[in-house]
Swiss-Prot record:
Changing G8P: Reduced antimicrobial activity. GO terms for biological process: defense response to bacterium. Keywords: Amidation, Antibiotic, Antimicrobial, DNA-binding, Secreted. It is found in: Secreted. It comes from Lasioglossum laticeps. The C-terminal amidation is required for full activity. One of its GO terms (cellular component) is extracellular region. One of its GO terms (molecular function) is DNA binding. Expressed by the venom gland. The keyword Secreted applies. Antimicrobial peptide which assumes an amphiphilic alpha-helix conformation upon contact with membranes. Insertion into membranes involves Trp-3. Penetrates into cells once membrane has been permeated. Active against Gram-negative bacteria E.coli (MIC=1.4 uM), P.aeruginosa (MIC=14.4 uM) and Gram-positive bacteria S.aureus (MIC=9.0 uM) and B.subtilis (MIC=0.7 uM). Has cytotoxic but no hemolytic activity. Binds DNA in vitro. This is Lasioglossin-2. Changing G8A: Slightly increased activity against S.aureus and E.coli, reduced activity against P.aeruginosa. Shows hemolytic activity.
Length: 15
């Protein structure tokens, strides 16, 4: 699992 991609998506959604 690519946590970097998941975290990036979460950060984009959070913003």
């Amino acid at each position: 699992v690519n946590w970097k991609k998941i975290l990036g998506k979460i950060i984009k959604v959070a913003k």
